[in-house]
């Protein structure tokens, strides 16, 4: 493979994304989000008032200069496919730009869907190889972060790596959920273990482990060779973290890329932001953080915009009811099409077309699109799924036993409410 000159970072930053294709793994079920992902894949879950989770990986690609993207789907893909078709159809075929949807089609192994993350790429190799890319960027479609992939590509080329893994320190008590690595002084990965029961600590900080973020850069030809070999191995689980990365590490061809080098943030002194919103509490907390005075993730950075499907909606409206009570909000995100009538909304996130009727108190709540809240309701520490109709006078988040009986309540006390749960309680969901 022809290597670009290493003494011109600006040239590398322009050329490497053009020579690359990004593959976003977007087929995950997200079972830890409970009923929130029964009817949609985790990357299609709403986030941040107007976005879907996958919008962050897609926006990172566009902002990094990568305009050849494959989205690999599987579980409950309709909502995700519809969102991408509606919101990400602005690419130019004449310029060889595209977002290619790659659903599981059981072409390779007949009876099998994707057997692992690596197999998801393997089953689409006949399509991916036609992209004729020199580099392949593998991404998870279910994380919240801002990253300039061109900087990671530069790091990959300058180190002469065949595979580069983005990494960041995590608390050692949380590291069992990740692939954990050890690196030498040149950032070559010398050991890699997927989800170890006893994660090794970093030599420089015994309270942290160096974790893989599930973001990889490969030399394309090398990746295809590895995947074809892995596909023939009956003992493999066909997973990047469990099989592919450890094998490359043993061969001495894998390098680490510290996430702070490519993390995009407005405040250079802030901690690099990357979240796996895989649990209900993490999802709720990450949404509410955006409504705080100084959120950890800057959504207002015009130099690194997060794109999404834009609906034609009127502005949010706050009105007083007939009794004279004013609609008020504080430290909240309220999206287009919302109407707050004679109620108070505090430290909450309201997605498009939410209607809050009179005498309600909404505190620390996430209300997904088209939620209707009847009069005199009190909602606290909860996530209300799309199009739920909350009946008049309902109280959520104040009585742990009652919440657990009627809805799903996490160990941390976050309550998830869906239309099916409300129907089982006898509440009609049509209005």
Swiss-Prot record:
One Pfam family linked to the record: Hexapep_GlmU
Keywords tagged on the record: Allosteric enzyme, ATP-binding, Carbohydrate metabolism, Glycogen biosynthesis, Glycogen metabolism, Nucleotide-binding, Nucleotidyltransferase, Transferase
Signal peptide start-end: none
GO terms for MF: ATP binding; glucose-1-phosphate adenylyltransferase activity
Family annotation (InterPro entries): ADP-Glc_PPase, ADP_Glu_pyroP_CS, GlgC_bac, GlmU/GlgC-like_hexapep, NTP_transferase_dom, Nucleotide-diphossugar_trans, Trimer_LpxA-like_sf
GO biological process: glycogen biosynthetic process
Residues involved in beta-D-fructose 1,6-bisphosphate binding: 39, 429-431
Enzyme Commission number, as recorded: 2.7.7.27
Subunit-structure text: Homotetramer.
Functional summary from the UniProt entry: Involved in the biosynthesis of ADP-glucose, a building block required for the elongation reactions to produce glycogen. Catalyzes the reaction between ATP and alpha-D-glucose 1-phosphate (G1P) to produce pyrophosphate and ADP-Glc.
Record protein name field: Glucose-1-phosphate adenylyltransferase
UniProt source species: Klebsiella pneumoniae subsp. pneumoniae (strain ATCC 700721 / MGH 78578)
Gene, per the UniProt record: glgC
